[in-house]
Regions:
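Active-site rim elements
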Residues: 139-150, 245-252, 323-332, 433-439, ...
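Conserved beta-strand->loop/alpha-helix structural units within folded catalytic cores of enzymes
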Residues: 85-100, 115-118, 380, 384, ...
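N-terminal glycine-rich phosphate/pyrophosphate-binding loop and immediately adjacent elements
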Residues: 72-252
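Glycine-rich active-site loop/strand segments that organize a redox cofactor
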Residues: 42-49, 122-154, 299-320
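Conserved flavin/dinucleotide-binding core of flavoenzymes
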Residues: 34-75, 129, 192-195, 400, ...
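Mid-domain catalytic core of redox enzymes
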Residues: 374-376, 380-510
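Extreme N-terminal leader/targeting segments of oxidoreductases
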Residues: 2-85, 104-109
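Active-site/ligand-binding neighborhood in enzyme catalytic cores
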Residues: 236-382
């Protein structure tokens, strides 16, 4: 790798090394502010244009880690002359939705403060910007898409309506060639062969379901002949691999056995061959086939439904596996939602009219977020370390900003932050509630956006998505090609473009570990991997997959933005590792109980890693504090 990203990008990520600060925890409380500049407009604070290590970036987690890992926090706080009707911890979708629901119910003059530990708002719903020759290029920094929004709750739908989000326009605005939104669009499988990566023939999603020319597709892969024949038989659907079981035994099997066990024990595939079906499983469940049940794997689009006989009909009926879901995309992922919310809450953040029609290209003035004359104030780079109810019925909230320890007061407080930090913020919580919160482990994720000079090499693949199950990043695709919000995606292969790489940390699994144990291990991998290592992985993978089509990583890559989320998706209960609790007794339900003037609003509290759960939790928390 003879050419690397600039030292500015490198230093933005490498300094954390193993994820533990080089300073002692107490030294963190004396740090100076981190400088963030817009490369297009020097000396302007504009985080979306930063490249290098983003997501859980340097400065966003050290204070919280000191609190959670060693119990250290400031001994004294400066009491600010600020009182609010509501203090919200976290300015992601749940936090911003909380502010919106509260303002709608209590009036536009309600005083609200949002505190967030990151240098940008949006939580996981961040956007990455690139600029080339006056053109704006957008990428997804975290939260990806709206999933089946027609099935949202009435409150979640009402929020989208309040923001002016037109779902019909979103459907019409995106290219039909974008495989993440349209599985009929061409997508391919790429796996290593003896002479480099081989890209299989045919639509890989269709091949997995036994559609199209399965034999030609599978025969094009660099696999042993014996494995090829097993795959062709498996995908053809002509054999019932559970024919030795009764119908009841089959149903028990698909719920209690791992997908990997089915592929290796029933179908007879070897370990390496089985992994070719794991890309989407990893992206949805953040573990591979060893740690999801057969029925869960099928729900993620993995093959096998056509090869289990009569139980497939029951699965279709009970699991609702028929393709009724819908994925809608903004050009910057779900970052559009918090941007629209911020514009509603703090109108002065943009000049002139900013709405659904032009939100994608609107410039936000971050200096306007935390002005005293705002009824809603959004304070970034502020890590909350404590929240407790005072004797007078108010709530004091302690936080650290740029090394300074501050205290503000509110009539109410809603915690819209990572669930796992809450027992440390509120040590007075009942033990049962703390245990409920601690049960879950957020799933780690790593998403990268790669700014390319042009799309010539990628266009020669003839597909918008490449599954790479044996590489560091499971999927290579393109930034959403949609005109929603005024965005203009690339029109020809000669235009600059953004590649979107999605992955989860590859943690060795024997199948005996629970998904929660693997998430913990994966989180350590994400924190301990330097930007330099990620950069090398990205360059090597892109060169291996695209090199035969004329790609040269040394000259074609202009910038890399690596969005690491060690605390990524909210934990969702699994068939293999979690019991079925009675209503109201699941850990997330116990953990989200109202605690006097303090409520909890986040997707963790819904045990569901989607935009609508963040919105629903916000509405619930506001109702708790205002009813």
């Amino acid at each position: 790798m003879s050419r690397q990203i600039t030292r500015r990008d490198f230093c933005n990520g490498i300094a954390i090394g193993t994820g533990i600060s080089l300073l002692s925890p107490m030294d963190l409380f004396g740090q100076n502010a981190f400088t963030i500049q817009n490369p297009e407009q020097p000396f302007v604070y504009y985080p979306p244009t930063l490249t290098g290590m983003r997501g859980s970036h340097k400065g966003s987690f050290e204070v919280a880690h000191a609190l959670a890992l060693t119990g250290e926090k400031p001994a004294k706080y400066e009491k600010l002359d600020e009182e609010y009707d509501l203090v919200i911890v976290g300015a992601g979708i749940s936090g911003l939705a909380t502010a919106w629901f509260y303002q709608k119910k209590m009036g536009s003059d309600a005083r609200i403060l949002l505190l967030d530990n990151h240098d940008d708002f949006g939580g996981h719903a961040k956007r990455n910007e690139f600029h080339q020759d006056g053109r704006l290029l957008l990428g997804i920094g975290g939260s990806v898409n709206l999933e089946s929004p027609t099935d949202y709750s009435q409150m979640a739908k009402s929020l989208l309506d309040d923001l002016g989000i037109d779902l019909d326009l979103m459907r019409n605005n995106i290219s039909n060639d974008f495989a993440l939104a349209n599985l009929s669009s061409n997508n391919v499988l790429a796996i290593p062969g003896p002479d480099g990566h081989v890209i299989g023939k045919g639509n890989w999603f269709y091949t997995m379901q036994g559609e199209g020319d399965v034999k030609t597709s599978i025969n094009s892969l660099p696999l042993a002949e014996s494995e090829i024949q097993k795959l062709i038989q498996f995908l053809s659907g002509e054999h019932d691999y559970l024919d030795d079981l009764s119908l009841k035994e089959k149903y028990d099997y698909v719920q209690s056995k791992s997908y990997h066990q089915f592929l290796t024990k029933k179908v007879g595939l070897n370990e390496d061959t089985a992994t070719i079906f794991y890309s989407m499983i990893r992206l949805i469940f953040c573990v591979d086939g060893k740690n999801v049940s057969f029925i869960e794997a099928i729900s993620a689009g993995a093959p096998g439904l056509q090869s289990v006989g009569s139980v497939a009909k029951i699965m279709l009926k009970l699991g609702n596996f028929l393709d009724t879901s819908e994925s809608l995309y903004f050009p910057d992922g779900n970052s559009t939602v918090p941007r629209l919310l911020v514009k509603k809450l703090i109108p002065a953040v943009t000049a002139g009219r900013t709405d659904f029609e032009n939100i994608s290209t609107s410039y936000f003035n971050y200096k306007m977020l935390d002005r005293n004359d705002n009824s809603v104030r959004l304070r970034l780079n502020s890590t909350v370390v404590g929240a407790r109810e005072n004797g007078d019925g108010s709530v004091q909230v302690d936080y650290v900003k740029n090394g300074d320890a501050m205290r503000v007061k509110g009539n109410h407080c809603i915690l819209a932050c990572y669930n796992s930090i809450i027992p440390y913020l509120c040590p007075e919580l009942p033990d049962a509630q703390k245990e409920g919160i601690r049960y879950a482990e957020k799933a780690p994720l790593v998403f990268a956006n790669i700014h390319l000079n042009d799309g010539i090499a990628f266009s020669k693949i003839g597909a918008s998505l490449i599954s790479c199950p044996m590489d560091p990043f499971d999927v290579i695709t393109v930034a959403p090609p949609t005109i929603t919000g005024g965005h203009q995606p690339p029109q020809t292969p000669n235009d600059p473009m953004v590649l979107f790489l999605l992955g989860v940390p590859k943690v060795k699994s024997t199948g005996s570990e629970t998904s929660r144990e693997l998430f913990k291990a994966g989180r350590h991998v994400v924190y301990s991997t330097s930007f330099a290592t990620y950069e090398k992985q990205i360059r090597d993978q892109l060169q291996a997959v695209l090199g035969d089509y004329g790609f040269n990583h040394e000259t074609d890559i202009k910038a890399i933005t690596l969005n690491r989320w060690p605390h990524g998706y909210a934990y969702e209960y699994t068939a293999l590792y979690d019991p079925e609790w009675e209503e109201g007794q699941a850990p997330h339900e116990i953990g989200r109980a109202q605690f006097g003037k303090i409520s909890i609003a986040n997707s963790d509290s819904e045990a569901y890693a989607y935009v609508n759960s963040a919105i629903d939790s916000a509405w619930r928390a506001v109702e708790e504090q205002t009813s």
